Every structure is written in structure tokens, then in C-alpha cells.
Amino acid sequence: MQIEISANSRKLHGTGANRRLRSQGRLPGVIYGGNGDAQSIELDHKDLYYKLKMEAFHASILSISIDGKKEQVLLRDVQMHPFKQQVLHIDFQRVRQDQKIHVKVPLHFINADIAPGVKLSGGMISHVATEIEISCLPKDLPEFITVDLSGMTAGSTLHLSDLILSENVEIPALLKGDNLPVATLIAKRGEAGESSEE
């Protein structure tokens, strides 16, 4: 299910205009890229604030309706107030179906409890990364990538090359030769000493 956003064109610009907009419960933003010019928009702050809490909102193709005209976009940047629960500005990028996009998607770790290094050795899994950058066409964009930890033993590490990706999805870091760690299983401290004392 695609997430939909409603917006309106924004005519007034500048700090004063944006402050007035926020006082009315509206949020200034911009949409750029694709085949169109950059366009200033305004959105409902409350609606966007709650959508930003959705994981999928950050790693999905979104449908934005600007004055009734729909476009496909990606969330690119969010500026938050330093201490208030307030979004100050939001950026979206248009996507073209025939053009690859680079997006950070979250990692969902599963089966940690049945990993031999946890179940048998009492080790602990450390998530080195919680998201990774991928490259693909918009139609192939996954909401998340599942990381199966069931085979991990004490002292082992899962790398980017161990991730199972759907077809047509690439990890740019791997193409550059950077096979970065994703998760490690840390052995229980003093395990060897404890077993020898017994």
C-alpha cells in the first residue's frame, strides 16, 4: 500500500512567511528533481509529523498530491526543531520509473534467539548497522531488508555480502569493494574461564 500525502503550492517565501505558516499548523517544504522545476509546497504539520513516525515513510516511494496533481516522490530531508516536537522543513525528490534511485533502507533482524552463539554459548548480538544504502529502480524498492541471524556462532560477523537481496537491488558499497559488517555475535565474557573451573 502506497503512502499518500496531500500538499498545496506555496506562494510566499522567507523566514517570516514560514513562521506564519507554522503558526497556522502548516509545514513548508520543497519538491525537486525528475523532469520538473523545484516547487515550494506546504503541508499539514500534524499529518506529516505522524507519518514521519512510520518506518516505511522513510524508505518508500510516496504519492504526493499537489493541488490535486499526483507525483511519485522520495523523502530526502527533514529539518526538526532542536527541542520542540516540530518539523521545520521537509524535502521530497521526484522519481522517474526508468531511473535508478539511491535510498537508505532499514534492516530487520530476525532469529537472534535461535542463533547457536546466543542459544548455546550465551553470546550477544551487536547490530553494527541498522540501515544500508541500496540502488534500484523505484518499482524494485524494498521497504526493508531482512537479516537472518540464525546461523551466527560466537565471534562470527555478518557482512553486506551475506545479505539476501531481491533481484535488481544492488548495494553501492559492495560495488566499491567495501564489504562492511552488519552484525557481530560477541562471545560471553569469561565463558572459557567458567567452563574450565567446572
From Swiss-Prot:
Residue ranges of the TM segments: none
PANTHER family, alphabetized: RIBOSOMAL PROTEIN L25/GLN-TRNA SYNTHETASE, ANTI-CODON-BINDING DOMAIN-CONTAINING PROTEIN (PTHR33284), RIBOSOMAL PROTEIN L25_GLN-TRNA SYNTHETASE, ANTI-CODON-BINDING DOMAIN-CONTAINING PROTEIN (PTHR33284:SF1)
Protein name: Large ribosomal subunit protein bL25
NCBIfam families, alphabetized: bL25_bact_ctc (TIGR00731), PRK05618.1-2 (NF004128), PRK05618.1-5 (NF004130), PRK05943.1 (NF004612)
Keyword terms of this UniProt record: Ribonucleoprotein, Ribosomal protein, RNA-binding, rRNA-binding
GO cellular component: cytosolic large ribosomal subunit
An annotated Gene Ontology molecular function: structural constituent of ribosome
Pfam families: Ribosomal_L25p, Ribosomal_TL5_C
CDD domains in UniProt: Ribosomal_L25_TL5_CTC
Function: This is one of the proteins that binds to the 5S RNA in the ribosome where it forms part of the central protuberance.
Organism from which the protein derives: Nitrosomonas europaea (strain ATCC 19718 / CIP 103999 / KCTC 2705 / NBRC 14298)
Keyword Ribonucleoprotein carried by entry: yes
The organism's taxonomic lineage, starting at the top: Bacteria, Pseudomonadati, Pseudomonadota, Betaproteobacteria, Nitrosomonadales
GO process terms (BP): translation
Oligomeric and partner information: Part of the 50S ribosomal subunit; part of the 5S rRNA/L5/L18/L25 subcomplex. Contacts the 5S rRNA. Binds to the 5S rRNA independently of L5 and L18.
Entry annotated with the keyword RNA-binding: yes
Highest rank taxon of the organism: Bacteria
Family: Belongs to the bacterial ribosomal protein bL25 family. CTC subfamily.
InterPro entries listed in its UniProt record: Rbsml_bL25/Gln-tRNA_synth_N (IPR020056), Ribosomal_bL25/Gln-tRNA_synth (IPR011035), Ribosomal_bL25_b-dom (IPR020057), Ribosomal_bL25_C (IPR037121), Ribosomal_bL25_long (IPR001021), Ribosomal_bL25_short (IPR020055), Ribosomal_L25_dom (IPR029751), Ribosomal_uL5_bac-type (IPR020930)
